[in-house]
Regions:
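Short capping/connector residues at structural and topological boundaries
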Residues: 6, 19, 26, 35, ...
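Double-stranded beta-helix
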Residues: 39-106
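Short edge-strand/loop segments of extracellular domains
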Residues: 3, 49-56, 114, 120-126
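Short histidine-centered beta-strand/loop micro-motifs
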Residues: 12-16, 22-25, 87-88, 106-110, ...
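Conserved double-stranded beta-helix
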Residues: 1-47
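Short, surface-exposed loop/helix-turn segments at secondary-structure junctions
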Residues: 12-16, 66-81, 111-113, 131-139
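Non-heme Fe(II)/2-oxoglutarate
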Residues: 61, 94-96, 100-156
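Extracellular structured ligand-interaction cores
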Residues: 27-31, 43, 84-86, 114-118
């Protein structure tokens, strides 16, 4: 859900999903972004940097930082001229990216909301890691099929 934005209020900063998932190893995690409405260049599409899933982590990038210009400067300082691709989708289409792909989205300038949903999924290559602190309960929730269902047979 991304309603019409005022300036940068609807921005999602450049980030990798993996930076928010300390309870998983570095492989086999993906995000599916499902468009429930048409997504145009003016509705704040998800934007990707192809190949960035092979980059090292970059300090200073954060989903919650709405200043995309300063974050794009950080990206260019680290990797030079970068290519950014918008995920322009019709309702019902899906965009899938690795948890290590840098992505963001800008403001929705349309009169109607941009509507979508996200599904995070993992392959058999994803390895759970025990963490401490506030994230420590997530692994227990992953064993609960009512919260984190498995779509294939076998033991989680």
């Amino acid at each position: 859900w991304k309603p019409k934005s005022i300036k940068d209020s609807g921005n999602a900063g450049w980030h990798r999903d993996s930076q928010y998932w300390p309870f998983w190893g570095n492989d086999g995690l993906f995000t599916a972004w499902i468009a429930l409405s048409n997504v145009s260049t003016s509705s704040g599409p998800v934007r990707f940097i192809p190949g960035s899933n092979h980059w090292k982590d970059i300090d200073g990038l954060d989903f919650f930082n709405k200043d995309l210009i300063s974050q794009e400067k950080i990206l260019k300082d680290n990797y030079g001229n970068i290519k950014i691709v918008d995920a322009l989708l019709s309702a019902g289409q899906v965009s899938i990216h690795s948890s290590h792909t840098y992505h963001s989205s800008g403001a929705n300038l349309d009169e109607t909301p941009r509507v979508g949903m996200v599904v995070h999924f993992c392959t058999d290559r994803a390895i759970r890691q025990r963490v401490t602190g506030s994230n420590s309960t997530y692994l227990d929730q992953l064993k609960d099929a009512s919260i984190s269902p498995f779509i294939f047979g076998g033991d989680p």
